[in-house]
């Protein structure tokens, strides 16, 4: 499926974006190995998260999926209750699922194969294979990419590990393995990354120690069931935040969005660029802060993106670069080489698409330089990347003519009702097949 957009006359209204993808992954995994029943409200029913649910079900976890209410009811099997799956576990397009499951499965008393789609089979796994091997895991992989064959070892040993890059997925993988290891596992980060795993471990009553840059867990503990309500995903909200910011006449409110400080890079950077964003009704529930976000149109200026904001914005850069494309002046992003090993090479994909829409964009090995200008209509390729697809749908709100975005089926991995909500606030996005359009 493709997206076809036409320029918007302005966004308005109030919407609630779906539940946070990162928290959904972690919540169902921890609930599955907890003792007792956990109800998960606000679960993201996207393809990535449902791949995690399916994997846990194949290992014996009882998970009732109430899809139309975004609810899971999970009967935990306890720390030692998982069973060998009958076949390879298919993680679909989800790098988070395969990396979290690798940590969980490294310490089990059975062997497992983890695989995924063609995109996932190009994603780098050496970053988890090396530290898990130090803990005593044995993992076979050709070229350090999936499929991964994990030979479970119930006698893992805790390690002290310095992450070479700020990565919440790698950190979480090792913390999960640490739950099954003898002794203490401590992870030190070069910069803060999203901390949902740490917050959820606390929510499920598991003891951990944390300071500014390190997190430690000791093996042998238990997780206790605890109902959880998942806030809206700020990565999904970011598309509407940018769309309203760049489109004249816009004013929207996004309700009950997760505003975890380790995820606020996109708001921090947009405010540096001059955005009019107001965060209100701040509350904290289930260890996670939430708030309403009101956004009004504003004129933006280009900036040099501070390195400390890069890990806090890593998933939102595609749409942030759309904001940079219409800002006055130059925006420079560096220290973001991680963008090249996402679902696609996001640096190359964004530079390619922006150039096709008339924007001066230059690729760097670890980032991009964008000279703000005027978006023209045209046709771009999402390269089967959900965030690239939605980012260029946002570009279409302000472009001088229609924008066609190719290969958007993967939006279902993270935001199944994106088109519906986009049109609800006035973005004019249509899903089309063949050469149809508006």
Curated annotation (Swiss-Prot):
GO annotation, biological process: amino acid biosynthetic process; aromatic amino acid family biosynthetic process; chorismate biosynthetic process
Enzyme class: transferase
Keyword hit for Cytoplasm: yes
Annotated keywords: Amino-acid biosynthesis, Aromatic amino acid biosynthesis, Cytoplasm, Transferase
Positions of phosphoenolpyruvate binding: 21, 95-96, 123, 169, 346, 387
E.C. code: 2.5.1.19
Pfam families the record matches: EPSP_synthase
Catalyzed reaction equations: 3-phosphoshikimate + phosphoenolpyruvate = 5-O-(1-carboxyvinyl)-3-phosphoshikimate + phosphate
Residues annotated as the enzyme's active site: 315 (proton acceptor)
Single GO cellular component term: cytoplasm
Subcellular location(s) of the protein: Cytoplasm
Keyword flag Lipoprotein: no
Binding sites annotated in the UniProt record for 3-phosphoshikimate: 22, 26, 167-169, 315, 342
InterPro entries for this protein: Enolpyruvate_Tfrase_dom, Enolpyruvate_Tfrase_sf, EPSP_synthase, EPSP_synthase_CS, RNA3'P_cycl/enolpyr_Trfase_a/b
Pathway stated in the Swiss-Prot or TrEMBL entry: Metabolic intermediate biosynthesis; chorismate biosynthesis; chorismate from D-erythrose 4-phosphate and phosphoenolpyruvate: step 6/7
Major localisation: cytoplasm
Residues covered by region (Phosphoenolpyruvate): 93-96
Molecular function via GO: 3-phosphoshikimate 1-carboxyvinyltransferase activity
Similarity comment: Belongs to the EPSP synthase family.
PANTHER family: AROM/DEHYDROQUINATE SYNTHASE (PTHR21090), PENTAFUNCTIONAL AROM POLYPEPTIDE (PTHR21090:SF5)
Annotated function: Catalyzes the transfer of the enolpyruvyl moiety of phosphoenolpyruvate (PEP) to the 5-hydroxyl of shikimate-3-phosphate (S3P) to produce enolpyruvyl shikimate-3-phosphate and inorganic phosphate.
Subunit structure: Homodimer or homotetramer.
NCBIfam families: aroA
Name of the featured protein: 3-phosphoshikimate 1-carboxyvinyltransferase
């Amino acid at each position: 499926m493709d997206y076809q957009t036409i320029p918007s006359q302005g966004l308005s209204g109030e919407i609630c974006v779906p539940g946070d993808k990162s928290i959904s992954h972690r919540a169902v995994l921890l609930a599955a190995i907890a003792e007792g029943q956990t109800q998960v409200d606000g679960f993201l029913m996207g393809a990535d998260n449902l791949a995690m649910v399916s994997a846990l079900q194949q290992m014996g976890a009882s998970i009732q999926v109430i899809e139309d209410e975004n609810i899971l009811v999970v009967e935990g099997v306890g720390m030692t209750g998982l069973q060998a799956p009958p076949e390879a576990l298919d993680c679909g397009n989800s790098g988070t699922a395969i990396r979290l499951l690798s940590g969980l499965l490294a310490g089990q008393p059975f062997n497992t194969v983890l695989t995924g789609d063609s995109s996932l089979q190009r994603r780098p796994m050496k970053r988890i294979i090396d530290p898990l091997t130090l803990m005593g895991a044995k993992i076979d992989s050709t070229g350090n990419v999936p499929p991964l064959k994990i030979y479970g070892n119930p006698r893992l040993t805790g390690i002290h590990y310095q992450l070479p890059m700020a990565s919440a997925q790698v950190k979480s993988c090792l913390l999960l393995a640490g739950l099954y290891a003898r002794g203490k596992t401590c992870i030190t980060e070069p910069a803060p990354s999203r901390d949902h795993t740490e917050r959820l471990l606390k929510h499920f009553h598991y003891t951990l120690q944390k300071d500014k840059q390190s997190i430690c867990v000791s093996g042998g503990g238990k997780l206790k069931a605890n109902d959880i309500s998942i806030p809206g995903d700020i990565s999904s909200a970011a598309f509407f935040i940018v769309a309203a910011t760049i489109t004249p006449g816009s004013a929207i409110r996004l309700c009950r969005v997760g505003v975890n400080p380790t995820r606020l890079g996109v708001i921090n950077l947009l405010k540096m660029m001059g955005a009019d964003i107001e965060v209100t009704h701040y509350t904290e529930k289930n260890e996670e802060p939430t708030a309403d976000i009101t956004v009004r149109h504003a004129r933006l200026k280009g900036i040099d993106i501070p390195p400390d904001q890069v890990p806090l914005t890593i998933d939102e850069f595609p749409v942030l670069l759309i904001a940079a494309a219409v800002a006055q002046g130059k925006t420079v992003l560096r220290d973001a080489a991680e963008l090249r090993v996402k679902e696609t090479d996001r640096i190359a994909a964004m530079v390619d698409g922006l150039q096709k829409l008339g924007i001066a964009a230059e690729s760097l090995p670890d980032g991009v330089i964008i000279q703000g200008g005027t978006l023209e209509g045209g046709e771009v390729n999402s390269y089967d990347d959900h965030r690239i697809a939605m980012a260029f749908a946002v570009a279409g709100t302000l472009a001088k003519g229609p924008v066609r975005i190719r290969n958007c089926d993967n939006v279902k991995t993270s935001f199944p009702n994106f088109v519906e909500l986009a049109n609800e606030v006035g973005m004019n996005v249509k899903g089309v097949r063949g050469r149809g359009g508006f």
